[in-house]
C-alpha cells in the first residue's frame, strides 16, 4: 500500500516525453510522433551530427531537466533486453561507452529477458518477481534521486542518488536503449506511455 500511494503521487508529475531522432543510433527507427523506437537491425542512412550515439543502440529525449520533479513511463513489452534512465546532456556520444553514474548515466535494464540490473559499479542485481512490461521513472532533482518502479505491481525497484553536478554539465535527459546490437534484432518497440492506466 505504501508504494501504491507513493507511485500514485509520483504519477501527478507525469510529463510529455518525446524521443530525439538526432541522438538515435542509425539502427534505431522512431515512429512519426516520436513516442516509440525499435531496432531495425540495419544501419540506416541518417545525418551525422555530434548529438548522435554511433556505437551503441542508445538515444535520448528531446526534453531535458535542470530542476523540479518529473515522471514518465515506458512500455518495454516482451523485449528481452533494454535499458532506461537518465543521462547528462554532456555525455560522450561517440565510441565505446560504459553505462555508469561516473560517466553521466543513471540507468537500469534487463538482459536476456530474465535478469534485471541497476548499472552501478559494479552492477546491482535487482529482485523482480516475474516480468516487467512497464517501467515508471521518477526524477526528483532537488532531492538528487532517480527512482524506478514496477508499474504493474506498484512496487519500487531501485533508487539512484544523483551526484551533485555543476550547471556546466547541462540538463538531465531521459535515456533509452533497445539493448545490445545483435545480428537478429528484437524488433518490438520501446513505447512511451501516454496516459496513466490505473489497471496496469
How should each PLM-predicted stretch be described?
Residues 1-200:
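Beta-rich ligand-recognition domains in immune and ubiquitin systems
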Amino acid at each position: 500500500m505504501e508504494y501504491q500511494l507513493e507511485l500514485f503521487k509520483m504519477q501527478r508529475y507525469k510529463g510529455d516525453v518525446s524521443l530525439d531522432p538526432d541522438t538515435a543510433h542509425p539502427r534505431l527507427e522512431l515512429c512519426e510522433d516520436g513516442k516509440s523506437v525499435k531496432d531495425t537491425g540495419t544501419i540506416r542512412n541518417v545525418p551525422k551530427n555530434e548529438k548522435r550515439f554511433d556505437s551503441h543502440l542508445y538515444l535520448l529525449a528531446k526534453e531535458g531537466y535542470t530542476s523540479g520533479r518529473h515522471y514518465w513511463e515506458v512500455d518495454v513489452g516482451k523485449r528481452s533486453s533494454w535499458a532506461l534512465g537518465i543521462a547528462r546532456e554532456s555525455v560522450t556520444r561517440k565510441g565505446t561507452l560504459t553505462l555508469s553514474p561516473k560517466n553521466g548515466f543513471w540507468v537500469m535494464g534487463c538482459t536476456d529477458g530474465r535478469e534485471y540490473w541497476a548499472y552501478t559499479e559494479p552492477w546491482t542485481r535487482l529482485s523482480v518477481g516475474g516480468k516487467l512490461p512497464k517501467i515508471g521513472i521518477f526524477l526528483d532533482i532537488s532531492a538528487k534521486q532517480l527512482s524506478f518502479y514496477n508499474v504493474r505491481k506498484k512496487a519500487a525497484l531501485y533508487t539512484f542518488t544523483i551526484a551533485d553536478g555543476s550547471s556546466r554539465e547541462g540538463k538531465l535527459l531521459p535515456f533509452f536503449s533497445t539493448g545490445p546490437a545483435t545480428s537478429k534484432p528484437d524488433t518490438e518497440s520501446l513505447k512511451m506511455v501516454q496516459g496513466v492506466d490505473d489497471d496496469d
